Amino acid sequence: MDSCEEECDLEVDSDEEDQLFGEKCISLLSSLLPLSSSTLLSNAINLELDEVERPPPLLNVLEEQQFPKVCANIEEENELEADTEEDIAETADDEESKDPVEKTENFEPSVTMDTYDFPDPYPVQIRARPQVPPKPPIDTVRYSMNNIKESADWQLDELLEELEALETQLNSSNGGDQLLLGVSGIPASSSRENVKSISTLPPPPPALSYHQTPQQPQLLHHHNNHLGYQNGIHQITSINSAASSCSSPDGDSAFGDSSSTESSNNRCRNSAFSSNDSCRDSLNTPSPTQVSPRNGELNAEEAKAQKIRQALEKMKEAKVTKIFVKFFVEDGEALQLLIDERWTVADTLKQLAEKNHIALMEDHCIVEEYPELYIKRVYEDHEKVVENIQMWVQDSPNKLYFMRRPDKYAFISRPELYLLTPKTSDHMEIPSGDQWTIDVKQKFVSEYFHREPVVPPEMEGFLYLKSDGRKSWKKHYFVLRPSGLYYAPKSKKPTTKDLTCLMNLHSNQVYTGIGWEKKYKSPTPWCISIKLTALQMKRSQFIKYICAEDEMTFKKWLVALRIAKNGAELLENYERACQIRRETLGPASSMSAASSSTAISEVPHSLSHHQRTPSVASSIQLSSHMMNNPTHPLSVNVRNQSPASFSVNSCQQSHPSRTSAKLEIQYDEQPTGTIKRAPLDVLRRVSRASTSSPTIPQEESDSDEEFPAPPPVASVMRMPPPVTPPKPCTPLTSKKAPPPPPKRSDTTKLQSASPMAPAKNDLEAALARRREKMATMEC
């Protein structure tokens, strides 16, 4: 009983303390809040306190007669508490096993200050973060114009010849129909014979007027009807001025077709329209710098730009997309080429090799580099170059390289290193022995790639994986399967159920890393990246970074990923590359020594086509002709024209023992003995031989191309007249000698030292000392 009374007293004291503490808190909050807010707070609290009935004090409820009965009930409840715990646990388990039913018991919520939401007098406005729009796709027109702007004059001449060849095919009866049907008029496998035949045409005149254009009147008429020029005036726009005045020139006047670009790449539809409309007026309206001040006459560059625009209009009719691309070589030099959208990488490599006189090998390739992403990859020969370029974003610093990569087809020359895995024997028979012959290798590679389907080498092992959003690397167990690349999130060797697909190879490409040790803190430089082909963003869901422990592991994984991506097309590309090499090097290897002089005579013509080193060609031709035909002369003709050009035409007479060659050299000034020009004495000997030779007929001789007559002997041996010395104005007189110097006194007089005895060597000094010593001993 006493314990019950003490508990009741403690409860009463605690209730009073809580009430006093609550009142103090309310008063403190009212003083801190503004007047309006404190009034609302106090009214709300009082209203709720009135609604809730406060229980009366315990001593007022319990009467003296009922107090013992209440204490007895409390003791009974304490005794029965332990007995009812097990029953309560069993009923709870039964309720959980049954279907959940919503409880509808009406409980009175407790009154707390958290249930009141007061309006904020100064609400904070949270603005949504603006989304960064993605970069627009590359504009092929602008890309081509930028490459042309940096090209040299001889490269522009080559481009003009290619466009003229295409224009000639479009004007023909069958060429236009073939291009409209999607058949290339200039096959990629053919040589540049048509282009060379067009290059023999006379060059365009240095100046053309708007109304006096004799070449191709039908082209101008068609061009005016399509572009809507008024009064039949064809407005000319130079390439350099168009590239500098507008960053995105019109698709009708540059190296591509806007309509064909839309059909091949729908992503750039809106950006192409906006860029074309913004620059249409600037291209159709000639600026004062584009038209020369001589009454509508054009200079040589504007005439070339006119021809290029005319040929491109014909390209538009054929729905052909061409991009002027720049390829870099290992020494930094740029090779430029106009690429058709239907050309594969193999066709582009062949055109580059033929244009630049390079012996094409199987390991020649085109390498694509992404400087912003620090990755690069080798284009496969069956891919389309134009399609890959159209996936770039605008103003991207991406580059294309033309180089040799021995690792391109290393898995064909060494299949025992790259294609063999512990599970290869489950699918096919493995040859015995470590040293495989060439026949065994070819047979194994053929069987490997002619399976259906082609299964890549099932590579397994530990590789480093870069964490998303951090420059930390963790080692995981990777497994390569035909469906994609899998890894285990846990570092230990997993089972099949623990593998997770990292990337599939259906819509992704395999790249290699560049400088990841400095950029991403990679543990080794042997890095592989798997990226979505159509996107160029540094996001973890689009690009994955993997690193191998050593170089051989890196090469094996790279080959396996390429086979999983491309399959049997790799072997087809290799066989086609070997066929192109045999076609290119076959005629050169069968050339005899008797026809070597003919080959040498063709070298200057090819060099003049590029206008690179005419002096080398001239020296080769002069020396070879003087050595092979010492009795047959050469007619050397010099013109004071610019630019310097060099051409050789060799012809044979009816008599087999007599041949003649006509050499035409055009220089800016008279020939001298510099490295760029033939020596003067050689030219004089050749000229004397040509004047005294009766083999050249009168029809081929031209008085304007001969050397002038030598000067007369008198003018050469003329001596200058003697020059008489001038007479002096005043007579010459002899000069007087200066007075002698005064005598010095004895104090200041220089005194010479006493003469020294002649110097003695060591032997003489020793002998003298010995004689003196012996003389003293005798005394």
Swiss-Prot record:
Record's GO cellular component terms: filamentous actin; growth cone membrane; lamellipodium; neuronal cell body membrane; perikaryon; presynaptic cytosol
Gene Ontology biological process terms, A to Z: axon regeneration; cell projection morphogenesis; egg-laying behavior; lamellipodium assembly; locomotion; mesodermal cell migration; neuron migration; presynapse assembly
Single annotated GO MF: SH3 domain binding
Keyword Repressor annotated: no
Parts forming coiled coils: none
PROSITE patterns, per the entry: PH_DOMAIN, RA
Pro residues: compositionally biased ranges: 708-729
Low complexity compositional bias, start-end: 242-254
Region (Disordered): 78-105, 189-217, 242-302, 645-763
Compositionally skewed regions (Acidic residues) per UniProt: 78-97
Localization, UniProt: Perikaryon
Keywords: Developmental protein, Neurogenesis
UniProt domain Ras-associating: residue ranges: 317-407
Positions with biased composition (Polar residues): 189-200, 256-293, 645-660, 688-698
Domain PH, residue spans: 456-566
Effect of deleting the gene: Defects in axon guidance in HSN neurons although axons reach the ventral nerve cord in the end. In max-2 and mig-10 double mutants, the phenotype is more severe resulting in axons failing to reach the ventral nerve cord.
Complex formation: May interact (via Ras-associating and PH domains) with ced-10 (GTP-bound form).
Family statement drawn from the similarity comment of this UniProt entry: Belongs to the MRL family.
Protein name: Abnormal cell migration protein 10
UniProt organism field: Caenorhabditis elegans
Lineage of source species: Eukaryota, Metazoa, Ecdysozoa, Nematoda, Chromadorea
